[in-house]
Amino acid sequence: MSVDATTVRRIAHLARIAVTDDEVPHLQGELNAMLAFVEQLSEVDVEGVEPMTSVTPMQMKKRADLVDDGEITDKVVANAPASEDHFFLVPKVVE
C-alpha cells in the first residue's frame, strides 16, 4: 500500500492542516514509511505470544469506587453568581 500526492492533500484537508505543494512529496514519503512499518508488523509471527497491556509486570492500582463530593463544594459554588444548597442557580431558559 502506498500514499499518492492526492491522498496526502486529502488527509491534510481532513486534519485541517495547511500543506504547501513543496511539502507534499516529503509528507508522502513519511506516510509511506509509516505504512511500510505497519506492514512489517503484520508479518511478525505472534503465535503463542500472550497478549499484554504493559511490558512491566505490575498490577493496576485501584481505588474504591465511592461517591464523594470532593469536600470543596463551597469553593466551587463561591464563583457562581447564584447558588442554593450547593447547586448552581441559572436563569430560566424555556418558558
From Swiss-Prot:
GO biological process: glutaminyl-tRNAGln biosynthesis via transamidation; regulation of translational fidelity; translation
Group of enzyme by EC: ligase
EC number, UniProt record: 6.3.5.-
Family annotation (NCBIfam families): gatC (TIGR00135)
Pfam families: GatC
Assembly description: Heterotrimer of A, B and C subunits.
Organism of provenance: Rhodopseudomonas palustris (strain BisA53)
UniProt catalytic activity: L-glutamyl-tRNA(Gln) + L-glutamine + ATP + H2O = L-glutaminyl-tRNA(Gln) + L-glutamate + ADP + phosphate + H(+); L-aspartyl-tRNA(Asn) + L-glutamine + ATP + H2O = L-asparaginyl-tRNA(Asn) + L-glutamate + ADP + phosphate + 2 H(+)
Superkingdom classification of source: Bacteria
Name of the protein described by the UniProt record: Aspartyl/glutamyl-tRNA(Asn/Gln) amidotransferase subunit C
The protein's role, per its UniProt record: Allows the formation of correctly charged Asn-tRNA(Asn) or Gln-tRNA(Gln) through the transamidation of misacylated Asp-tRNA(Asn) or Glu-tRNA(Gln) in organisms which lack either or both of asparaginyl-tRNA or glutaminyl-tRNA synthetases. The reaction takes place in the presence of glutamine and ATP through an activated phospho-Asp-tRNA(Asn) or phospho-Glu-tRNA(Gln).
Family matches, as InterPro entries: Asp/Glu-ADT_sf_sub_c, GatC
Upper classification of the organism: Bacteria, Pseudomonadati, Pseudomonadota, Alphaproteobacteria, Hyphomicrobiales
Family: Belongs to the GatC family.
